[in-house]
Amino acid sequence: MDWSRLPDIVAVGLLASAFASVAGRNLTRVSSIWLTGWLLIVLHFTALMFFPAPGLWGMLAGLIALASLTWAGSLFMWASVPFRNESSSRWMLWLLLASNTLYICALDVGGPPWLLTCAAILLGTGPLMLTLLTLRRFSHRLRWMTVVLYFSLGIFLLSVQRRAGNGPDLALNGVLFTVYLGCCFHFWYKYRRATTGAFITICGFFAWSCVFLVSPLKEAYFPAIRIESEVWNLPKYVVALGMILLLLEEQIEHNKHLALHDVLTGLPNRRLFQDRLTITLERARRTGTKAALLVLDLDRFKQVNDTLGHHVGDLLLQSVARIFNGRIRRSDTVARTGGDEFSVILEGPTNAAEALHVGRSLQELLKEPMELENRTVKTGASFGVAIFPDDADDLEALCIAADQRMYENKRANQVSDEHYPKTKPPASQSAKPKGGGRFSLHL
């Protein structure tokens, strides 16, 4: 047994434990695939401990060590595929796992030349054939990147595997180089945003792939230079560190999202709404433009909750959120600011007529009956509009103005655009809703 591998087993095992601890209860499919990959790396080092054993056990240990290393890389690559749920993506994973394993086994046990040739052809053309067979149903640039990588690998294997001397070593390093360079490309595609964890992971995978390129070059041209195994294994630890940072970054982003969004509807909550409204008003004040605040309150929502249950009420709120999201511009903001209250910030060049048009459009959409839990639910909405700076010149007064007009709207039974205030009250009254709450709209 090679006891020098024990520190690597302990180190990678501890990293895998730390990874599992960070993932914790929020273990996603991606992080579970990553964890499986790191357990395979632990298996890789464990098998290397038994590799010096003579006979069958040593050969099996070598095969397990190589296969687990390629399986881990294939899983890391697949975890970063944005279309994992696509059936052809799963077929591609199994094809790569099978063809890599077949070639490594044929190479390691010294299989006949025809078997090596067939395995190399399968490894090089298998992804291409699968991509062409599923082209009508699905296509993606990452899929074609994989095709190019493995087609190039197939050509390389056919050219070096029969070379005397270091041919088998070059072929083996070529397979591992392709697997981990594919990880680098896939992670770069998925995590292109400039975060520390993404940068470290991508660089780590690139360095990991370069190990299988530099090692044969060193043996060929600088055989006298000795590099310790810890140096070759360093990229593995860099990737592990990067993945742990990625998990932490994603959890921080998730917590930020939960703090600023409504859990039920996914819309911005009151806190984020007020932040965005503050920014909108500052921008409008700086550019001399107007902004509108639209407040909508659902009609008969309490009746839905009382008669059909809170579950149906929740479904109603989610449906309303989807409707509003589908009709509001990207530059605008729709938020859930109360139990059955929604608020909309209308940015850019806007005026009372445009804001009223948006409010009426949303109002009309809610007139349509909704099918929830095989039940037809009818609701409606009352809304109020306030324009900055015509109705108020600060956030609090603008919200009060819109709220008061919405509540007057609920009490009234008619639409009366004529009552919209035409003049701006004196600045001394800016702490109160401007227009005296005379604007009246109702469903």
Predicted regions and their residues:
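Conserved nucleotide-binding and Mg2+-coordinating catalytic segments in signaling enzymes
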Residues: 256-275, 296-310, 318
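Catalytic-core segments of nucleotide cyclases and related cyclic-nucleotide turnover enzymes
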Residues: 352, 356-363, 367, 371-373, ...
